[in-house]
Regions:
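Bacterial N-terminal signal peptides that target proteins for export
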Residues: 2-15
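Boundary at the C-terminal end of the N-terminal hydrophobic targeting segment
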Residues: 28-31
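Secretory pathway targeting signatures of secreted, lumenal, and periplasmic proteins
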Residues: 35-82, 114, 120, 177-235, ...
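Surface-exposed amphipathic alpha-helical segments
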Residues: 41, 45-49, 87, 138-188, ...
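Short, solvent-exposed coil/turn segments at beta-strand boundaries
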Residues: 47-50, 62-64, 106, 129-136, ...
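Short, well-ordered beta-strand elements
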Residues: 67-70, 134-143, 211-214, 286-295
Length: 320
């Protein structure tokens, strides 16, 4: 899961970096359209793909392949313009090609990207579509060696439809829920993450306001030492610089072992002093991560609000 860099429109950019893939023009897929839980998107999954347990989309574990669907507030044309060769290269990805196509009767950008992860070369296909208010991103990933999946995944991505009357419930398909407070409202959802903000919006409002994001890991992941993992995870945030005066404590929420961290830092983009809040909860091979950011001069009040939200965390179903 990626955590937003600021209180404004940086959330979509962070998710773009995390969810890059490609697609190209192809015939329709073979399965019947399936609504992706937690989204307003439907597509025809390839044979052998099933609804994912930890993210919004479909997966085929035996092939290490997935299709991830994400909806973002913000204009699609702006998002498409940012998908440059240089931006991809800065994230360790190689742009193979890109093209403009029409999907669901609308113009969309298709990118083909390759990336090496854990010694394996993957191909990522990404569709970036939508309108002036919302962006739809559909990412297909598969090992380069599994070439038999190339066409089926491409077909599935290009079969996507969206923008109908179907409105997903905030917690639909999630492994958990967490409740808002009068101060921190539920602004929305991005994939398997809930976004809380003071304004109740993900892309608008006062940049001085606080934001909290909570989600779960998108794949199975064993954690032997919760504190060690939490401290390491906090230092990997790209939203702030070096952490200072780190204060941590072990705690239990909904019966799960966890570790909470509060630290001083400076915003990576503006240099402004902020407070970072983080909570990690572990359930077997799934972990839940909450990260919040607030200007330092408002930390005393808002840190309590972060804790009120995370204190309502409750599992809705067991991950498989």
């Amino acid at each position: 899961m990626k955590i937003p860099a600021s209180r404004r429109a940086r959330l979509p950019l962070v998710l773009v970096i995390a969810l890059l893939a490609w697609a190209s023009m192809a015939p329709a897929a073979h399965a019947a359209p399936v609504q992706v839980l937690g989204t307003g998107v439907a597509l025809e999954p390839p044979p052998g793909f099933v609804p994912a347990q930890r993210f919004t989309g479909f997966e085929r574990d035996v092939k290490s392949a997935s299709i991830v669907v994400t909806e973002l507030e913000g204009p699609a044309p702006k998002m498409q313009k940012g998908m440059t060769r240089e931006m991809l290269a800065s994230r360790g990805m190689t742009l193979i090609r890109s093209q403009t196509v029409r999907v669901h009767g609308k113009s969309a950008l298709l990118l083909q990207v390759s990336q090496v992860a854990a010694g394996t070369e993957f191909l990522k296909w990404m569709l970036v579509a939508g309108d002036t208010k919302k962006t739809v991103m559909i990412v297909g990933t598969f090992p380069k060696a599994a070439n038999d999946l190339a066409l089926p995944i491409k077909q599935a991505i290009l079969s996507a439809t969206w923008g109908g009357k179907v409105q997903a419930a905030p917690y639909e398909g999630l492994l958990f829920r967490a409740d808002p407070t009068p101060v921190l409202k539920l602004a929305g959802r991005v994939g398997n993450a809930l976004i809380f903000s003071e304004s109740g919006s993900m892309t608008h409002g006062d940049p001085n306001q606080a934001i909290l994001v909570m989600g779960n890991s998108s794949s199975a992941f064993s954690i032997a030492n919760v504190e060690q993992f939490a401290r390491d995870r906090a230092t990997r945030s790209t939203q702030v610089g070096e952490l200072r005066n780190i204060v941590g404590r072990a705690l239990t929420v909904d019966g799960l072992p966890g570790y909470e961290i509060v630290a001083e830092a400076n915003d990576a983009r503006t240099g402004r002093e902020v407070r970072m809040y983080q909570l990690v909860l572990v359930e077997q091979k799934t972990y839940y991560l909450a990260q919040g950011f607030v200007p330092a001069d408002r930390a005393r009040v808002i840190l309590d609000q972060f804790r009120q939200v995370t204190g309502t965390f409750k599992r809705l179903r067991a991950p498989k």
